């Protein structure tokens, strides 16, 4: 299932993949929740748009990843914008 975000960063089911794609293309600043470089390490938290939940009623729509350094390829996914922000902070402190 594909999603967009409302003005409060709450997920809204998209009516089609085209609606979700259009939203993503026109909301790049909201798709990238937080992105930071620390030396050669890049930490990125983004809205995925596609539900990554397995056997869950709650969609998993955000993801934090670390690229580079000792935690390269670290990944966490979240069910809310607020959890994604907290997860990004956690990744910064690894």
Label each PLM-derived region with a short phrase.
Residues 1-41:
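Negatively charged, low-complexity tracts enriched in Asp/Glu with abundant Ser/Thr
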Residues 2, 72-75, 85:
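Replace the tail clause
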Residues 7, 69, 82:
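Short, ordered coil/turn segments that flank beta-strands lining enzyme active or ligand-binding pockets
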Residues 13-17, 44-46, 74-80:
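Short amphipathic beta-strand/extended segments with alternating polar/hydrophobic composition
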Residues 45-74, 90-91:
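Short aromatic-glycine-(Arg/Gly/Cys) micro-motifs in beta-strand/loop hairpins
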Residues 78-94:
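A short, charged, amphipathic alpha-helix used as a generic interaction element across diverse proteins
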